[in-house]
Amino acid sequence: LLLGLLAPFALHDILPKFDEELTVYAYEKIWSELSELDRKIVYIISQGVNKTGDIRESLGVSPQLLNTYRKRLMERGVVDGSRHGELTLALPRFEEYINMYCEVTI
């Protein structure tokens, strides 16, 4: 029944509105509350760098420092660290938000 209701709408028709709602009601607030290093880590992940060793190397930080930020970002639900040695974004379409609206200097 639900599929029948959604059938007239193509995904490309509803994604812009979905992205706008995520941006206005969630992602702007989440991004504004991240520290500078949090933002750099999340930005690097959004660029496809997922291995913690590569993230550390990109930022020039120690394993201990990255681990502190990793834990904090996981607790906030921003990143997923369930796979050993890897970090991914946990929020739907957050990568698109970052690439569209956020400027980060590494």
Regions found by a protein language model. Give the residues of each.
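C-terminal leucine-rich, beta-strand-based interaction scaffolds used for sensing/assembly
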Residues: 23-106
